[in-house]
Amino acid sequence: MTEQRGGRRGQLASSELRPGWTTGACATAAARAAYTALLTGQFPDPVPVVLPQGRTPTFALTAEAQGEGWAEAVITKDAGDDPDITHGALVRVRVSAGEPGGGVGFRAGAGVGTITLPGLPLPVGEPAINPMPRTMIIANLRLAAGLDAEAPDPDLLVTVGINDGEQLAAKTLNPRLGIVGG
């Protein structure tokens, strides 16, 4: 039996499901907020984020903190009506100075795993932060700094964490993929 909803066979009308955001989009917003605070001393709230398709949503901050040479922002993930295990999770990003000439580096914070087996799009030993979120984070850090296309990336260390991420990841494929710690 095929249901007809929203004018298309077998598909629900878009108005029936509430859209949400990926963990990567939430991490991007938190990173941009933290870096903006490092640059200006103020956390933007809401935080604008430019997505790869050109959309510019805003994200509300859940928490913020700043210390000598670092800033941290937290976004509560809203996955919409998607049955995402990380819905409601706190996505925490700390931005601090990186290696001179090293561009943007990534570190796994509490609840974000580390890749331990080959076969994923990132090398063994890297934090399990996928290539697209890395690209989005770097692009939004560049926007926050007002860098033009020719300027090198800022030298920053971006540490991404997920509250209770290790427990959440145990319910996913991460352990079978060799991602340990979240």
Model-derived segments and spans:
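Generic N-terminal targeting/processing segments that precede catalytic cores or assembly contacts
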Residues: 2-181
